[in-house]
């Protein structure tokens, strides 16, 4: 057994670039600037683990307390004393209760420890010989340090895995959004503190089993009506969810190098035991994830998940400030909303670090990470900012639809009957038109739209770049057989129709009206 609070088990990078391992007790050290996990999902998991520690053991009482810590630093002695209050929940090893392991001894067959990795090939994948990218037996032996973080990461991201295997309280493969400083030399604790919320009081010893579910018999979910909700648990369990019943086999070990970090260890762990019908979470809103809700009355809030192609700039507004279209409204993560109200002196630029798996039920299709520009704009200007961005995104979305329709008209004699997969075009479109949008976003974030000539210029450049992209892309994809006169006529007709339909868009007229209004203000 070892304590996850005192053991030097977290790989970190110092200001000089040196890598070493630290214990959470050393988090107050300003010389430590980042974590250093070899896998991005473990890196993201480690950030969430440490944020959870800060939130649970050391949360500020109010905004003034938050600012005091930000400016004066984590006080080492107070931090270590705060961690002692949750020490019973942070023991890792074979003796129960143990960190994120089932309270009971599981009567199940042993399976490979690779099952702690979300992207490891499952039984059906192996049976059908479909492990093309992540091969079977790639991850068979983990050191205890990597095992602890892999266990936390799979519990917090838990995807669907068969009958009775519960997903995380955010669903399978949730997206996480953290506020991060542009200055990468900030100490690690400051990067974490940006994502800590104020709370009126810290938990008592008696409340620990309601926060850390492995400290008590598992509230299993074989029968309906036995879900864990914010009403029958502590709100801080959001950081320590345990949907999977897992037990690590500490008796079957061997010496060698860890398949995750590469370090030598005398007792590498190789097997785990799983059991279905673990904790079923209902009604939780995780502070580190954004949510989406259908505009239909009574629709639930659902956490955003990874998606094919990752995030695009059409998603930025919803993740940073919240947004709404004719189908859904997006609510930023609670930590992002809290950050938007803070003011820093001197001003500090931030970005949003968004990451998560794109899951197809139990199958991990891809891991995505994005760094999006965050916002620190005056509340009085937010409405104007939102209106302009929503117009611009609506123009981009509508224009993409017109481009796809025009390509079908150009490619097929009966386009209405033609079927096709435009996913590659969708991804390329949002990626290749992002640069001008990023410039516009930056202009809008820095200046009030109705007072800025820069915004007017950026709007014009954005619309011009979008228009040019549409026709360059159409020509590249459609004009591939100029010797076929009949096809050429069809292509040119489709091109003229694209130009006509683009110009007729109501949202384009709204954007041009906006540009004209700005021009009048500038000339006044």
Give a label for each model feature.
Residues 1-126, 153, 158-524:
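Extended alpha-helical scaffolding segments
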Residues 143, 152-153:
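Acidic (Asp/Glu-rich), glycine- and aromatic
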